Regions:
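Amphipathic beta-strand/beta-sheet edge segments enriched in Tyr/Trp
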Residues: 52-53, 117-189
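Bacterial N-terminal signal peptides
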Residues: 34-45
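Residue-level detector of Asp-centered blade-edge/turn motifs that repeat once per structural unit
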Residues: 201-202, 245-246, 288-290, 332-334, ...
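Hydrophobic beta-strand positions that form the internal "hydrophobic ladder"
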Residues: 206, 250, 293-294, 338, ...
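Short beta-strand->alpha-helix linker/helix-N-cap micro-motif
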Residues: 58-124, 140-141
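A flexible loop/linker signature enriched in serine peptidases of the S9 family
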Residues: 210-217, 233-236, 253-262, 276-281, ...
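Short loop/turn segments that connect beta-strands within beta-propeller blades
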Residues: 222-226, 266-270, 309-313, 354-358, ...
């Protein structure tokens, strides 16, 4: 366990550690570790259909589909096929494994003869031990004249009379990048069919801050950490990247001669575009589902929460406190609520309010709580919480998941360095976050129950991830 000095780091809200905490009468209540699954399943059964648990819980309490993903076969003699097949097979397997909803059958259990066409499927060999699978993904890939063609099927091998669940054909350039995209598309089709109609995330992007170029710039990568590339080249300090719901614009905070301002990058134009300057310190933009932007601004003195339209016009002040109030995040399902961090009672705590600034509610009741992010179904917040913050306390920044209505919470990370800036995937099954567990700040992902933790970045310091909406 890491021990933190009582003095907050520079990323924390100024002067908040010198004030005293206040207790809540409606305190956030822990769900004890041994009762996590039972308590949350009961809660979800009482408040939402089972589909919501699939979206949020990554299979807790739900039987996983047993799935075999056979290596696709070559359908042409082109020598380029070998490398392209490996790229496809590796990518498809990783996508299905990352989904968190399958019991993937080990390839060591597969029959010697794996199918490349429907006529080659040996049903008894697949639906009995050792594979004993319910579903089988298989197909073939061929490359010729610089083009690649792929045929893929998903079969219910327990239903020999009518086995086909999915059949797809794809064609693209015969390059590794194009084949990766095809694998992502096929994986997402399988996930959609077998995952309760929830769209897969294999084609989504993650935006983050990286120092590897010598400056804090905004970068992007595929959901699995592949294809990392720099977006901004401002040669300054850029923070808090937030992608718009349609994926066309990226809002972030950056410091220039005028101070901290909200900046905007257009992916349609592949360049920075103008955005109004508001004066004061302007930080942590957040998009609403309908394209408004909430952010923290000190234009009126103390940092408070403001909201503007997509072009930066029609600014409205939502909070009016000596806070400071920072880090807003919209309810991504309804757009009618905003969660944010405030130091109005001492140490920073998480609050919610209506999108017009009314109905203020305190969510956390102790410690040091920051970086809230709302789940796609609007039911949960995930955030970083040092529950025992203070001199002499063995505090640790861990990630928590809280049901907003009941204030019941579950701890997702356990004393694995500093963990911060969690962000939900669009399917609600995954969370990406920043962690210092490897000895430097890097981007990690996990299932929304805290399992299947994977490191996505390695080079340089990488922080503040934001997952695309789709």
């Amino acid at each position: 366990m890491e021990r933190r000095a009582s003095r907050p780091s520079s990323r924390r809200l100024p002067a908040l550690h010198r004030q005293r905490e206040h207790n809540l009468s409606n305190a956030a209540r822990p769900i004890r570790h041994h009762a996590v699954i039972a308590a949350l399943l009961f809660l979800l059964a009482a408040t939402s259909p089972a589909q919501d648990w699939i979206r949020t819980g990554t299979g807790l309490g739900v039987e996983r589909v047993r799935l075999a993903a056979s290596d696709f076969k070559s359908s042409t003699p082109d020598p380029n096929n070998v490398n392209l097949l490996k790229t496809f097979n590796d990518t498809l397997w990783n996508d299905l494994d990352n989904a968190g909803i399958f019991d993937l059958v080990s390839k060591s259990f597969y029959p010697l003869q794996e199918p490349g066409q429907p006529s080659e499927v040996n049903f008894p060999a697949w639906n009995s031990p050792p594979p004993n699978t319910s579903m089988l993904a298989f197909g073939n890939l061929g490359a010729a004249a610089g083009r690649v063609t792929l045929q893929g099927w998903l079969y219910d091998v327990k239903n020999e009379k009518s086995p086909q669940v999915l059949g797809k054909q794809y064609a693209d350039n015969a390059t590794p990048d194009a084949v990766r995209v095809i694998a992502h598309k096929f994986a997402d089709e399988i996930i959609f069919r077998l995952g309760g109609g929830v769209a897969g995330i294999a084609e989504t992007k993650i935006y983050f801050v990286s120092e590897r170029s010598g400056h804090k710039e905004i970068w992007m990568m595929d959901y699995d950490g592949a294809n990392q590339q720099q977006v901004t080249h401002l040669g300054s300090i850029s923070l808090s990247p937030r992608i718009s719901p349609d994926g066309s614009r990226l809002a972030f905070s950056s410091i220039n001669k005028g101070g901290w301002e909200i900046m905007m990058y257009s992916f349609d134009l592949n360049r920075m575009v103008s955005f109004p300057r508001f004066g004061g310190m302007n930080l942590s933009p957040s998009w609403s589902p309908d394209g408004k932007i909430a952010f923290s601004s000190s234009r009126s003195g103390y940092p408070n929460i403001f909201v503007v339209d997509a072009s930066g016009g029609n600014p409205r002040r939502l909070t009016n406190d000596q806070g400071p109030d920072v880090a807003p995040t919209w309810n991504r399902k309804t757009g009618s609520q905003i969660a944010f961090v405030s130091g109005r009672t001492g140490l920073p705590q998480i609050y919610t309010m209506e999108a017009d600034g009314t109905n203020l509610q305190r969510v956390t009741d102790q410690g040091y709580a920051v970086s809230p992010n709302w789940s796609p179904n609007g039911q949960f917040l995930t955030f970083s919480w040092e529950r025992k913050y203070g001199p002499g306390e063995p505090g640790s920044n861990d990630l928590y998941l809280m049901d907003v209505a009941s204030k019941q919470w579950v701890q997702l990370t356990h004393d694995a360095g500093r963990n911060d800036f969690p962000c939900w995937s669009p399917d609600g099954r995954h969370i990406v976050f920043q962690s210092h567990r490897s000895g430097s700040d890097q981007i990690w992902s996990m299932l929304a129950d805290g399992t299947n933790v994977k490191q996505l970045t390695v080079k340089g310091a990488n922080t503040q991830p934001n997952w695309s909406w789709k």
